[in-house]
Amino acid sequence: MLTIDEFHETVLSGHYASPADHLPARPLKKGFRAWWRFYASGLARVVAKGIRVVWKGNVTLKLFSELAYDMTRVVEVTGATVSFDGFDALRKLKGKPFVVVANHMSLIETMLLPAGVFAANDMTVVAKRSLTKYPGFGKILASCNPILLDRKNARKDLADTLEQGTALLKQGVSILLFPQGHRAEVFDPRKFNSLGAKLAARAGVPLVPVACKTDFARPGWPLKDFGPVDPSRPVRFACGQALDPTLPQRDLQKACIEHISARLTEWGMGVVKEQEENNVEGN
């Protein structure tokens, strides 16, 4: 099994695909056993590990990095393959701050994508404040110095993200955000706002788009965050080239949408076709 340092180095080489010794000899099929292994056995164990560290009061962003890699392993142990492609684009940014924007398909990218980003630099996330109220997970999230939004006042959320995000970026911490706001299996560019482009331009740091295919886990009912898992569905992340923050904001937004749309289409996922040119401007 790869150590976390070996994993990071492989990710920055440009291609990581789950090694054979990371996967079970007999992958589980979609059903209760896969659900149990992922949530009750895997996720619960990782959350418990994080809580123990938080209780001891010795929390650093390294914990966030370790837990993200642990969750990558949980997905693999359940039987799904995980791949990170194109992250060699981050090698030249290693140790430097940048902004990452990604589509929001499921809970999985919030847990696994940081594993790839941490390969290049420390990072934190923009998240809903309500997530900090989740048992266990909320305490871990709150300890990682996230930018928390109430999602009640769009103007205030924008101001908070730009102010707090710029301060963190100046401290050398990268920022990951999901401009869609809500999870959606079908990518609609009109709902992918330009907050990431605004933040990168304000702070003068590169903007990096990442496409995520994470339909391995789908929303459930009555508990949205504990839906069915299907190990036959690979988890994929594809990083685009770092974008110059001095480019016009419209061009930054367009480049991000084009990268994400192209990769999702390549993977057979749904993408809403833009009907009007101004759709790429975001909200």
Q: Predicted segments — roles?
A:
Residues 56-88, 120-163:
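Membrane-interfacial amphipathic helices and adjacent loop/beta segments
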Residues 105, 109, 157, 188-192:
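Short, glycine/acidic-rich beta->alpha junctions
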Residues 137-138, 174, 185-251:
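A cross-family acyltransferase "interaction/gating" segment
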Residues 1-97, 111-112:
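Membrane-anchoring hydrophobic helices of lipid-metabolizing enzymes
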Residues 116, 140, 167, 198-199:
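Hydrophobic/aromatic ligand-binding patch that stacks against planar heteroaromatic rings
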Residues 97-99, 172-178:
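Residue-level preference for the first positions of well-ordered beta-strands
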